[in-house]
Structure formats: C-alpha cells, structure tokens
C-alpha cells in the first residue's frame, strides 16, 4: 500500500467510526502497548541493554508483540490526528520537542 492509499484508508476508517469510538480504541491500544513493553522488561535477557536489537533481531516474541502494538497505536493516532485536523500541529510539536531534548543532551555532555 502506498502513502496515498494508506491515508485514504485511515480517513475511511476514521470517518466510519468517528472520534468517540476511535479515541476509546486508541486508549485500549496504548494500554496494550504498555503491557507489551512491560513484558519485555520482565525478560531477564534484556536487562541493562540499551539496544535490544543487538540480540538476534526480532526473534523474541516479546519484541514481535511490541511491533504489533506500535503499529496499532500509530494507526489509531493517524485517525485521531485526521479527526482533530491537527496533523501539521503535531509534526511541529514533535520537531520542537526533539530539538529541545537535543539541547538538553548537549548541555549535559
């Protein structure tokens, strides 16, 4: 699916269900992502690693579950941004926050 098809599909789904339904679904998907991340924390083989991808790629089921949940959350976020008409504003805010964090990192080094 190309980007245009993806966006058209997001719009169709968002318009069908509406903000109330999809905002509640987003909350559910975020909770599922939280649970998946927590499961990975409990796996001892990943303790004290900054980059878990050092360990055999995506072969662990906990990582695969996180990938699935990230996809669900991103799909729902795309719908919410469309429904609220705030995609551009979110991108601006992300850029601002990234630059601010890089400044903080630079000051601490």
Where are these regions (language model features)?
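Flexible "arm" and connector segments at domain edges
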Residues: 1-109
